[in-house]
């Protein structure tokens, strides 16, 4: 008979597998498309597009008051009226999208954006609508469809880019066109395949619930903007102080760390749903503690593996003009490792809807990021931006953990945590040495990490076998 603990792991691992199938396919498509972009676009063009997408990261949270976050969280509540949640969310989105039209004139007038105001507005509106659809499907606990639609979105983007960049040879204009058409295709697929068509009723409204959803979502607007500061403001500093070509190379340096971020996102999307369940069931803290330790070990292992293959992979992955990007990937990988830990602690705030305290961590991280960008980029160039990102992610993780650790009963410091940071730092520094020493020391750092944490290797294998055994019995 399946125990309560086993059912928790089954639910968590089941969601991880669903998100893995969708997200890894999505990221792999995006990852494999980068060589096409770097061959078809000049570094300055790639840097310009990266800058526009960074600006879109500021506009998107403001556009619809972050209502997609409220849709997902309130749809996950026990006994939620999904139709009402969706109808409120789409009405808020429609009103906000129309109200935001005058901002286009302001965007057109900003010189650095090069007259791309209407493109930014269209891109943000279409992507926000797509995000609302996906968040609603996820909020209905339909993780398989959510993951599949995410994969489909990436596939649409890839196919459209091949058509406009390679077949039609439209250059940067073709890249922009594909970025507008891809979310349209995904929205159509979500509308037809999900419950959106059945559940949306324009006349359905509840003022009390709408206020709750907006209150929850609007706190996340400054949070999203502050995360933008940590993730994208360095692009502006690098573009201004080092040039758009340097920013294009820096943008490529994010590609391998983004794969690490994808692994973390898969685990965290699944964990967030488990954390909400744990909160609603008033469960004890042992499950959360076990997951935190295992997550720390696993993400530390993935980080060191990525550090080991970073330099060699970029040599065959991008054109020669971009190959110096490996220099900046190391600090970004460790930053994303710290970010995955911060996201774990953030899930407790989301489960308890304690959004003001959640916001404080982003404030601290953004302040550190901007200050260090101002100080370090003029001094050490692009490496200063990578170092600032690393420091800001560590600050967010620490502030979040310190703010809620006692309430959730999860220990912050563990053997996997200390060894992960130590061995990852050793692996990062080894990469700057000449070969074969860099490879040898990187492998040695990973071997030490596995030996020190061998008990957690066995624990992961044991849990995985138990879940597989349960699934086989149900077949």
Predicted regions and their residues:
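Hydrophobic alpha-helical transmembrane segments
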Residues: 149-196, 363-368, 382-403, 443-449
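Interfacial segments at transmembrane-helix termini and the short loops linking adjacent helices
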Residues: 107-123, 307-337
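Helix-loop junctions and terminal segments of transmembrane helices
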Residues: 63-79, 257-292, 346-351
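Signature of the first transmembrane helix
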Residues: 8-68, 154-158, 162, 215-245
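Membrane-proximal transmembrane or re-entrant/amphipathic helices at the cytosolic face
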Residues: 2-4, 431-475
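Membrane-interface junctions at transmembrane-helix termini in multi-pass inner-membrane proteins
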Residues: 74, 127-152, 333-364, 404-406
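Interhelical loop/hinge segments that connect adjacent transmembrane helices in multipass membrane
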Residues: 2-8, 12, 118, 168, ...
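Helix-terminus/linker motif at the lipid-water interface of multi-pass membrane proteins
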Residues: 30-45, 167-168, 225-259, 270-277, ...
């Amino acid at each position: 008979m399946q125990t309560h603990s086993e059912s928790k792991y089954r639910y968590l691992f089941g969601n991880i597998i669903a998100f893995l199938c969708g997200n890894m396919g999505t990221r792999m498509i995006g990852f494999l498309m980068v060589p096409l972009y770097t061959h078809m676009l000049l570094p300055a063009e790639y840097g310009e597009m990266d800058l526009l997408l960074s600006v879109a990261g500021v506009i998107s949270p403001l556009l619809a008051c972050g209502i997609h976050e409220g849709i997902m969280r309130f749809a996950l509540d026990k006994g939620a009226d999904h139709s009402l949640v969706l109808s409120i969310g789409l009405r808020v989105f429609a009103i906000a999208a129309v109200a935001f039209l005058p901002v286009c004139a302001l965007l057109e007038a900003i010189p650095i954006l090069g007259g791309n105001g209407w493109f930014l507005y269209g891109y943000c509106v279409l992507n926000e609508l797509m995000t609302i659809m996906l968040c609603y499907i996820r909020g209905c606990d339909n993780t398989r469809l959510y993951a599949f639609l995410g994969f489909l979105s990436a596939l649409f983007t890839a196919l459209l880019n091949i058509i406009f960049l390679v077949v039609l040879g439209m250059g940067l204009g073709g890249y922009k066109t594909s970025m507008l058409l891809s979310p349209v295709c995904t929205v159509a697929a979500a509308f037809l395949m999900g419950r959106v068509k059945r559940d949306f009723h324009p006349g359905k409204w509840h003022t009390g619930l709408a206020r709750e959803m907006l209150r929850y979502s609007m706190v996340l607007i400054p949070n999203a903007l502050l995360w933008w500061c940590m993730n994208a403001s360095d692009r502006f500093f690098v573009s201004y102080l080092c040039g758009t070509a340097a920013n294009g190379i820096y943008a490529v340096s994010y590609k391998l760390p983004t794969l690490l971020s994808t692994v973390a996102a898969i685990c965290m999307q699944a964990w967030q749903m488990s954390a909400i369940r744990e909160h609603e069931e008033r469960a004890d803290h042992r499950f959360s503690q076990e997951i935190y330790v295992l997550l720390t070990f696993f993400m530390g292992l993935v980080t060191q593996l990525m550090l080991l293959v970073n330099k060699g992979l970029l040599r065959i992955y991008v054109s020669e003009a971009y190959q110096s990007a490996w220099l900046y990937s190391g600090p970004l990988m460790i930053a994303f490792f710290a970010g995955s830990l911060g996201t774990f602690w953030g899930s407790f705030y989301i489960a308890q809807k304690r959004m003001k305290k959640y916001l404080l961590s982003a404030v601290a991280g953004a302040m550190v990021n901007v200050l260090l960008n101002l100080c370090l980029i003029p001094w050490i160039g692009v490496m200063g931006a990578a170092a600032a990102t690393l420091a800001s992610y560590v600050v967010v993780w620490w502030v979040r953990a310190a703010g809620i650790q006692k309430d959730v009963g999860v220990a912050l410091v563990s053997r996997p945590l200390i060894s992960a940071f130590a061995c990852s730092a050793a692996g990062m520094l080894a990469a700057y040495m000449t070969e074969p020493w860099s490879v040898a020391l990187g492998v040695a750092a990973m071997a030490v990490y596995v030996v020190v944490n061998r008990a957690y290797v066995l624990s992961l294998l044991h849990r995985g076998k138990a879940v597989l055994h349960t699934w086989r019995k149900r077949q």
